[in-house]
Amino acid sequence: MRVILSAIGKLKKSAPEYVLMQTYLKRLKWSFDMKEYEEKKALSGEDLKNAEADLLLSGVPEKAKVVVLDEHGETLSSREFAGKLRTWQNQGADTVAFLIGGADGHGNRAKKKADLMLSFGRMTLPHFLMRVVLAEQIYRAQTILDGHPYHRD
């Protein structure tokens, strides 16, 4: 499986979040691509969210499954998340793209494209920290699917 993380904001390689994220990505057997885009500071409101949605979606293949991270999305356990990825694999999906929007959230264009709106809880997390949490959960899902003992119920 190929995993794409498409995010607004550029994370410096010297940032602790980047270093921690890399610890999980280096363990990942699946291919991983990160696409980062500059914030559109000149825009606001729906114009901003839709411009950012266009950027986030620009690097996503047409047939990819799209997961939009949003505080109002569906919450899944780690096993349920792994099961969702397995279902998509069994349906022939070879790419899953995760979208992390800007500070104002996602525009309707991104939400309409979503195969899953995913929430990691009702709290708002910093976008750079969310990348770490997502990387760990993708790695955890892979280990669950492989029967590796990393995940414990």
Model-derived segments and spans:
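Loop/turn-to-beta-strand initiation segments
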Residues: 2, 94-99
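N-terminal beta1-alpha1 ligand-phosphate binding loop
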Residues: 1-28
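S-adenosyl-L-methionine/SAH cofactor-binding core of RNA-modifying enzymes
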Residues: 30-96
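Structured adenosyl-cofactor binding patch, chiefly the S-adenosyl-L-methionine
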Residues: 108-152
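Short, surface-exposed alpha-helical segments at coil->helix boundaries
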Residues: 18-22, 53-54, 108-111
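Short hydrophobic segments within beta-strands
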Residues: 6-8, 35-37, 99
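Short glycine-rich anion-binding loops that position phosphate/pyrophosphate groups of nucleotides
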Residues: 11, 71-74, 102-105
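Conserved RecA-like P-loop NTPase ATPase core
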Residues: 5, 67, 101, 134
